[in-house]
């Protein structure tokens, strides 16, 4: 089974599909913000940046999936983004479940000074909502709970692909199969 996942990681179509899935999630977030008028909070913005990391890893893996260095780089960026996104989403759910005055998220994002995304792209990365508000739900789950499921799936995907990189692929031999 690990050989299947290693071969899967060496195909460009896998990385394109990963890129498209992250692009769809980013587009959906922008539709929720600008189309439906839902105000994103700081944690929503951070989760959006984590999805951008997964999108970026799909782009890197798509460049040359057969090159081990680029494949490992894409896996590391994707795994790091999935872990960070999952941790952020769990913390965001804590803000929604335990609504206390001392359990609040910041109102202004804390981006590095060298990468102030909220200043460069305010229509995308400027928060205007509260982290404890639940403004949307689907099938009984809030948006944050769905984000946890999505990041958990990405995390499992990247873990399996990372482990499969250590599996040696044997050459097909015609004799003595």
UniProtKB/Swiss-Prot annotation:
Its main location: membrane. It is a multi-pass membrane protein. One of its GO terms (biological process) is protein folding. Residues 1-14, 66-72, 165-177 are cytoplasmic. The keyword ATP-binding does not apply. Residues 32-49, 91-145 are periplasmic. The chain crosses the membrane at residues 15-31, 50-65, 73-90, 146-164. SUPFAM superfamilies: DsbB-like (SSF158442). InterPro entries: DiS_bond_form_DsbB/BdbC, Disulphide_bond_form_DsbB, DsbB, DsbB-like_sf. GO terms for cellular component: plasma membrane. It is found in: Cell inner membrane. Keywords: Cell inner membrane, Cell membrane, Chaperone, Disulfide bond, Electron transport, Membrane, Oxidoreductase, Redox-active center, Transmembrane, Transmembrane helix, Transport. GO terms for molecular function: electron transfer activity; protein-disulfide reductase activity. Disulfide bonds join 41-44, 105-131. Belongs to the DsbB family. Required for disulfide bond formation in some periplasmic proteins. Acts by oxidizing the DsbA protein. PANTHER family: DISULFIDE BOND FORMATION PROTEIN B (PTHR36570:SF2). This is Disulfide bond formation protein B. The lineage of its organism: Bacteria, Pseudomonadati, Pseudomonadota, Gammaproteobacteria, Pasteurellales.
